[in-house]
């Protein structure tokens, strides 16, 4: 299979409250032929650490994720659609959903907001024209994109990304126990390939998404640290890696459903002493 490529005529569609319904109709059509969905989110950093005793480092990392996702709001979601051959839909391949976010009322980490602002995110527009998450969830649940075993999700170091999606889809805080989180995850997203987890089997690949893309000689489209561009690059990286390192076949038993840094696949540092939360919150994706 040729390496997955996207020419510059492919474009990212910006979605706000005013065009959400129309764009979700388009996605319902696209998902029928392009059933690989590369995903990324942007969120306002990490503002809290859990306190108390934890059964393991993995438990600490999940509780860190849970307390921050429960406290904070998603800012952007990027979805890129690809078919089995690594081909993108003609015209629009990527949708960037911009959610309601208010810098006066909502919690955030200052360094994360500064990074996102410098990347071109327009917080005033998010406040005035952003999508309500509850209405998005209603449309998303019936889109054919979630709850479908035929849809394959592609992500990069995505514990927080899926955490925010589960919070939106369930309209509730994340479960207290990590095993329950993974049960809900499998319900909504039965097939997931986390590119960062796949990298464990790819000799010499290292770093964040941008660094990996450069090693794979992929060209980014759109601004870094925006969810649409990052989801597009995630999809490109997956198909290039599948070709180069996996002979165009991913072993589901070994790789499907694992999120880098969570569960038995945890690659985080010692409990409470490292910068794992900073790596995830400020990941180059």
UniProtKB/Swiss-Prot annotation:
Binds 2 divalent metal cations per subunit with RNAase activity being higher in presence of Mn(2+) than of Mg(2+) or Co(2+). It is an enzyme of class 3 (hydrolase). Its cofactor is Mn(2+); Mg(2+); Co(2+). It is found in: Nucleus; Cytoplasm. GO terms for cellular component: CCR4-NOT complex; cytoplasm; nucleus. It catalyses: Exonucleolytic cleavage of poly(A) to 5'-AMP. A divalent metal cation 2 binds at residues 40, 42, 230. Pfam families: CAF1. A divalent metal cation 1 binds at residues 40, 161, 278. Its EC number is 3.1.13.4. Keywords: Cytoplasm, Exonuclease, Hydrolase, Magnesium, Metal-binding, Nuclease, Nucleus, Repressor, RNA-binding, RNA-mediated gene silencing, Transcription, Transcription regulation, Translation regulation. Its main location: nucleus. One of its GO terms (molecular function) is metal ion binding. GO terms for biological process: miRNA-mediated gene silencing by mRNA destabilization; negative regulation of cell population proliferation; positive regulation of cell population proliferation; positive regulation of nuclear-transcribed mRNA catabolic process, deadenylation-dependent decay; positive regulation of nuclear-transcribed mRNA poly(A) tail shortening; regulation of translation; regulatory ncRNA-mediated gene silencing. Belongs to the CAF1 family. Component of the CCR4-NOT complex. Has 3'-5' poly(A) exoribonuclease activity for synthetic poly(A) RNA substrate. Catalytic component of the CCR4-NOT complex which is one of the major cellular mRNA deadenylases and is linked to various cellular processes including bulk mRNA degradation, miRNA-mediated repression, translational repression during translational initiation and general transcription regulation. During miRNA-mediated repression the complex also seems to act as translational repressor during translational initiation. Additional complex functions may be a consequence of its influence on mRNA expression. This is CCR4-NOT transcription complex subunit 7. The gene is cnot7.
């Amino acid at each position: 299979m040729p390496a997955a490529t996207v020419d510059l005529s492919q474009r990212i569609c910006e979605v706000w409250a005013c065009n959400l319904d129309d764009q979700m109709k388009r996605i319902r059509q696209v998902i029928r032929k392009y059933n690989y969905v590369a995903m990324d989110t942007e969120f306002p950093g990490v503002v809290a650490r859990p306190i108390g005793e934890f059964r393991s480092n993995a438990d600490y990392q999940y509780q860190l994720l849970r307390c921050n996702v429960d406290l904070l709001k998603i800012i952007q979601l990027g979805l890129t659609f690809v078919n089995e051959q690594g081909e993108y839909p003609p015209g629009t391949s990527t949708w960037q959903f911009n959610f309601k976010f208010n810098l006066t009322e909502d919690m955030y980490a200052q360094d994360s907001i500064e990074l996102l602002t410098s990347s071109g995110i327009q917080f005033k527009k998010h406040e005035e024209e952003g999508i309500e998450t509850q209405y998005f969830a209603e449309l998303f649940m019936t889109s054919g994109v979630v709850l479908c075993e035929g849809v394959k999700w592609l992500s990069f170091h995505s514990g927080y990304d899926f955490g925010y999606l589960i919070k939106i889809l369930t309209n509730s805080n994340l479960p207290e126990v990590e095993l329950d989180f993974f049960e809900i995850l499998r319900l909504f997203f039965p097939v997931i390939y986390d590119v960062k987890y796949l990298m464990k089997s790819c000799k010499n690949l290292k770093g964040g998404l941008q660094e990996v893309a450069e090693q794979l000689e992929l060209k980014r489209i759109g601004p870094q640290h925006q969810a649409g561009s990052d989801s597009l690059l995630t999809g490109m990286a997956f198909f290039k890696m599948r070709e180069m390192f996996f002979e165009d076949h991913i072993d589901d038993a070994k790789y499907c459903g694992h999120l880098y840094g969570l569960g038995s696949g945890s690659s985080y540092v010692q409990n409470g002493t490292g910068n794992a939360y900073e790596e995830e919150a400020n990941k180059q994706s």
